[in-house]
Amino acid sequence: MTVDRAPRITDGDTRLSFGSNLSSFSEYLRVHAPEHLPQNRFADTGGVVMGGGDVAPHGTTIVAISYAGGVLLAGDRRATMGNLIASRDVQKVYVTDDYSAAGIAGTAGIAIELVRLFAVELEHYEKIEGVPLTFDGKANRLSSMVRGNLGAAMQGLAVVPLLVGYDLDAVDPSRAGRIVSYDVVGGRYEERAGYHAVGSGSLFAKSALKKLYSPGIDEDTALRFAVEALYDAADDDSATGGPDLTRGIYPTAVTITSAGAVELSTAKAAEIAREIVAARTATASPEGESAL
């Protein structure tokens, strides 16, 4: 009796009988074009530590806040290279699919490639399987991709993403916004405090959010808190850029609800930033003096 060898389904992934993972685009690259994976761009350095902070732009700071019915991710725009400002308008927050977004901290070039590859990974999975990954599945996929960058991280070119998303399988839709952080070796951690931050200014951003945040806040309040946290981080961390009213450069943000992921408009970001700067200026000005 002859048995046909057909693809089988294992743990939500389509695999051929010889073990090739059809639903993973990064696995496909690893087998057929490994030189295009972000972590393999530095495979020929002979193990020499490169001092990534001085040879490649680094991006910080990213904050995430969950609110009633959703979650948001926001980031500043500055990238630094050693003691220099490498860029003032870097995009650090990316929509990765309809219900998730990722922010990047660490070596900017590798981090941006990794997040873009992650977005392709999610799209590829949905095309092959016919259904999107669950939020836990997305978090696990990103974890394995960060782990794959360990070689570059050991050379000083670390990537630390922050993942947020709306969990369509959540029992309580008002608490469906989820935040997952990672370490440089790919460990994933669910952040249940309702907020989190990564990057060089994360200590100051989290300290600000600790005083501001309360469960059940609405989206507009969460957006204001995120920009305030980035403002406070920029006040104490030279690698974090605050709102630049002169150049018209403001933090970027993505909000995610049951309706999907939406990028914050520049006009809205400018409005929030100007309100915060005006309020801080008025508070700091001596009584009777003009804030201007």
Curated annotation (Swiss-Prot):
Naming one, the record's GO cellular component terms include:
proteasome core complex, beta-subunit complex
Catalytic residues as annotated in Swiss-Prot or TrEMBL: 60 (nucleophile)
Q: How is its activity regulated?
A: The formation of the proteasomal ATPase ARC-20S proteasome complex, likely via the docking of the C-termini of ARC into the intersubunit pockets in the alpha-rings, may trigger opening of the gate for substrate entry. Interconversion between the open-gate and close-gate conformations leads to a dynamic regulation of the 20S proteasome proteolysis activity.
According to UniProt, the reaction catalysed is:
Cleavage of peptide bonds with very broad specificity
Record's subcellular location = Cytoplasm
Q: Identify the pathway.
A: Protein degradation; proteasomal Pup-dependent pathway
Q: A Gene Ontology biological process annotation? A: proteasomal protein catabolic process
Q: Which UniProt keywords apply?
A: Autocatalytic cleavage, Cytoplasm, Hydrolase, Protease, Proteasome, Threonine protease, Zymogen
- InterPro entries given in the database record: Ntn_hydrolases_N, Proteasome_sua/b, Proteasome_suB-type, PSB_actinobac
**Primary subcellular site in the record, as a coarse category:** cytoplasm
Pfam families according to UniProt: Proteasome
Propeptide span(s): 1-59
Task: Name the PROSITE patterns for this protein.
Answer: PROTEASOME_BETA_2
Q: Recorded E.C. number(s)?
A: 3.4.25.1
How does the record describe its quaternary structure? The 20S proteasome core is composed of 14 alpha and 14 beta subunits that assemble into four stacked heptameric rings, resulting in a barrel-shaped structure. The two inner rings, each composed of seven catalytic beta subunits, are sandwiched by two outer rings, each composed of seven alpha subunits. All four combinations of alpha- and beta-subunits (beta2-alpha1, beta2-alpha2, beta1-alpha2 and beta1-alpha1) yield fully assembled and proteolytically active proteasomes. The catalytic chamber with the active sites is on the inside of the barrel.
| Protein function | Component of the proteasome core, a large protease complex with broad specificity involved in protein degradation. The R.erythropolis proteasomes are able to cleave oligopeptides after Tyr, Phe and Leu, very poorly after Arg but not after Glu. Thus, displays chymotrypsin-like activity, low trypsin-like activity but no caspase-like activity.
Q: Per its record, how is this protein called by name?
A: Proteasome subunit beta 2
Q: Which classification does the entry list for the species?
A: Bacteria, Bacillati, Actinomycetota, Actinomycetes, Mycobacteriales
